[in-house]
Amino acid sequence: MRHALPIALPLALLLASPPALADEVPGFDRPGIGFGTDSVPRGALAVEIGLPGFQRERDRDGQRSTTLSSDLLLRTGLAPGLELQLSSTPWLRQRQRGPDQPRTRQRGAGDSVVGLKWAGPGSTDRTAWALLASGVVARGDAAFSDGRQYALAASVEHSITDRWSGALYASHQRGDGQRSTTWSPSVALAASDRIGLYLEAGFTRARHQPDLSVAGAGLTWMLRPNVQLDASFDVGLDRDSPDLQLATGIAFYLD
């Protein structure tokens, strides 16, 4: 029950709050591997919730695992173009089974992370960029923690036409003797005023770890001007990557 509160509280705020009054709602960071280039204005709040997502994978030794998780991201503006982010994975359930081994189950919470997002100068209506620096401030349960990690990421978005856009995301993460670099290209289509579609690929190269490659697609639907629903999937492109990742979520903006 203690991990359910961070998810239930934002949902209660959504149901109790009127629509945002801002002329333009900034873009949300979910779904997808990367993040958006918009920043939340000072005094406003964006809440982005991952409803239980699913991941299935098998390693080279034949051990299979399935994971259910729910994540939470809070974004609030500190100054024009600068926002504070707080994120965590308060709910995790994992089941593992290896060859000739009994099935094991684990539950708990992941790490909590603080980040600063800066929407860089020089952005235009056609091309925009942003940086995100983040670090773990509270470790989760041992089975789900990556230890003290710090990351610097960048995202660039370019509008090709009124409906099509492309983006490139890159990040470098290190800590606790680990080091990894991820990059992800994507292309998005505004199918209508309320529905968006995207395709993405992601590639991670880690120190002393196998390289990972995935590709997938997603859908966003603006339920209200300040409320977004999403669904997405990624599949592994090699034997070391997760076989399948499924995610759904909701995001809302309060001004």
Write out the residue ranges for each language-model feature.
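Bacterial N-terminal signal peptides that target proteins for export
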Residues: 1-8
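N-terminal signal peptide c-region/cleavage motif recognized by signal peptidases
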Residues: 16-19
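Transmembrane beta-barrel domains of Gram-negative outer membranes and organellar outer membranes
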Residues: 22-255
